[in-house]
């Protein structure tokens, strides 16, 4: 399903994302918009080596197990298919782990390209 922007803002605030790894909720909303278009079912194939799953586009090489990524680290200890359902609680735990280990949002290419260093106030405006 699509998670409406302001609902996502509420969910992220409730889960302590404001100020987490020094980033605002607006940064995360921008990341989600450009990674998955707010879709919980988002899927992206990166060729033979890995795939990205769910609203945060979590990668199968390092973070989740999809049964077809050779040498997957599965650092979030989760089946990738669980990252494409409507329950995003587990996605949130994994995304926080990724951000914590990176001390920021640099693992997400879309964040670096579209969000880093930009005015992101519009992502939370009116919520």
Curated annotation (Swiss-Prot):
State its Enzyme Commission number(s).
3.2.1.17
What does the UniProt entry say about where the protein is found? Answer: Secreted
Q: Does the keyword Cytoplasm apply?
A: no
The record's Gene Ontology cellular component field reads: extracellular region
Residues annotated for Ca(2+) binding in this entry: 82, 85, 87, 90-91
Q: Which GO terms describe its biological process?
A: defense response to Gram-negative bacterium; defense response to Gram-positive bacterium; killing of cells of another organism
Q: Where is the active site?
A: 35, 52
Instruction: Report keywords, A-Z.
Output: Antimicrobial, Bacteriolytic enzyme, Calcium, Disulfide bond, Glycosidase, Hydrolase, Metal-binding, Secreted
Cofactor annotation comment? Binds 1 Ca(2+) ion per subunit.
Q: Which cofactor does it need?
A: Ca(2+)
One GO MF term: metal ion binding
What PROSITE patterns does the entry give? GLYCOSYL_HYDROL_F22_1, GLYCOSYL_HYDROL_F22_2
Which cysteine pairs make disulfide bonds?
6-127, 30-115, 64-80, 76-94
Q: What is its main location?
A: secreted
User: What general EC class does the enzyme of this chain belong to?
Assistant: hydrolase
Q: Which residues form the C-type lysozyme domain?
A: 1-127
- Catalysed reaction, written as an equation: Hydrolysis of (1->4)-beta-linkages between N-acetylmuramic acid and N-acetyl-D-glucosamine residues in a peptidoglycan and between N-acetyl-D-glucosamine residues in chitodextrins
Explain the purpose of this protein. Answer: Lysozymes have primarily a bacteriolytic function; those in tissues and body fluids are associated with the monocyte-macrophage system and enhance the activity of immunoagents.
Q: Which family does it belong to?
A: Belongs to the glycosyl hydrolase 22 family.
Miscellaneous information on this protein: Lysozyme C is capable of both hydrolysis and transglycosylation; it also shows a slight esterase activity. It acts rapidly on both peptide-substituted and unsubstituted peptidoglycan, and slowly on chitin oligosaccharides.
Q: How does it assemble?
A: Monomer.
Q: What is this protein called?
A: Lysozyme C
Q: Which organism is it from?
A: Columba livia
